[in-house]
UniProtKB/Swiss-Prot annotation:
Any one GO molecular function term: mRNA binding
InterPro entries: Ribosomal_uL13, Ribosomal_uL13_bac-type, Ribosomal_uL13_CS, Ribosomal_uL13_sf
PROSITE patterns membership: RIBOSOMAL_L13
NCBIfam families from the UniProt entry: rplM_bact
Functional note: This protein is one of the early assembly proteins of the 50S ribosomal subunit, although it is not seen to bind rRNA by itself. It is important during the early stages of 50S assembly.
CDD domains: Ribosomal_L13
Oligomeric and partner information: Part of the 50S ribosomal subunit.
Gene name in the database record: rplM
Protein name: Large ribosomal subunit protein uL13
Length: 143
């Protein structure tokens, strides 16, 4: 008996909507990454992009456990000497809550071409409205 290998042209993609209100950031991000990779499907093949689309709503209402909102920093480098910048997650949650979820999920995906293709299927919105009604997304409940 041969092992099944999915072919890119055979992959059927679905759209899922996830409400992030009251969810813990890391736990939610790992579930989203699993869906983007396609690990929830029986046809999962590591070298083929078998994942689905994910729409995340209410990004501003996500929860960080402990004192991470005050203690955690997002660091980035501008490219200039002395250009290492730090932004506190509390401030980042006020200005760009979509980026917080995007950044957490991106860190859980493969660091190669496949991962770059997977992250393009993640759509994050603040508020409960999105512009993907035409795709008829399914509501997905994640604890």
């Amino acid at each position: 008996m041969k092992s099944y290998m999915a072919k890119p042209e055979e992959v059927k993609r679905k759209w899922f909507v996830i409400d992030a209100e009251g969810k813990v950031l890391g736990r939610l991000a790992s579930q989203i990454a699993k869906i983007l990779m396609g690990k929830h499907k029986p046809t999962y093949t590591p070298h083929v992009d078998t994942g689905d689309f994910v729409i995340v709503l209410n990004a501003e209402k996500i929860v960080l456990t402990g004192n991470k909102l005050e203690d955690k920093y997002y660091k980035y480098y501008t490219g200039y000497p002395g250009g290492l910048k730090e932004v506190q997650y509390k401030k980042l949650m006020q200005t760009k809550p979509e980026f917080v979820i995007y950044h957490a999920v991106k860190g859980m995906l493969p660091k190669n071409r496949l991962g770059r293709r997977m992250i393009k299927r993640l759509k994050v919105y603040r508020g409960s409205e999105h512009k993907h009604q035409a795709q008829k997304p399914e509501k997905l409940d994640i604890e």
